Amino acid sequence: MSFQSHVRNLDDLRGPDGRLEALLNTGTDDAPFTALVTHPHPLFGGTMHNKVVYHAMKAFSHFGLPVLRFNFRGTSRSEGTHDGGRGEIDDVRAALDYLTRTYAKPILFAGFSFGSYTGLRATCGDPRVAGLVALGLPVQAAGRNYTYEFLSTCTQPKVFISGGNDEFCPPEVLQQVAASSPGIWDTFIIPGADHFFQGTLTGPGSQLDGMRGLIQTWLIHKFHLKPLNLQEPLAHS
């Protein structure tokens, strides 16, 4: 089956602080899930156009799923003001509400760094969300400690993917965080990669394709998704 995803600018995604700039990669009519991907810390350049976010979107689009990305409040053209991760949780919930209204299908979530923390806070325990992908989950970054006691009630299937040289969450710490979560969870450590999935055991190089492949493999194994013969989206990144 050949499928060509289109990319749409959304004008009607609104959070508590106003309009949220967003892109929707369209999916097939019979897609069994929709997907949401959230970006890293906006005060350090994170937006929905981040390379890790883009590759996570491609992982979901590989199966013909509609994929929503948006900029947190105060980021780029999104209205409002950055709220240190508190109001951003409500932004994620607004995006979940949008997907539910538009598609009425189970949702798969992926977030990178700050986006994984805020996204997990919003999605853990939400019955609309069927599975969780945490990329580069931060534990200590930019002078802030991120804590994950809330994972003790997070029963959805989840996967944690990080680089072996992630400066914001060493692999042994990530394993401890994952083990605090009940239910089904997996961890994948990419040897040689840093927080942004750059670097190999032998030198420089990107590991984004490998990261994307791990997401796809996990989705096939956990949710029995079938890859489509995809053509590239018509616009945007």
Q: Language-model features: where?
A:
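Serine-hydrolase catalytic machinery in alpha/beta-hydrolase-like enzymes
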Residues: R19-Y103, F196
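Catalytic histidine-centered segment of alpha/beta-hydrolase-like enzymes
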Residues: G80, A193-L208
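Acidic catalytic loop of the alpha/beta-hydrolase fold
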Residues: A141, G164-C169, H195-F196
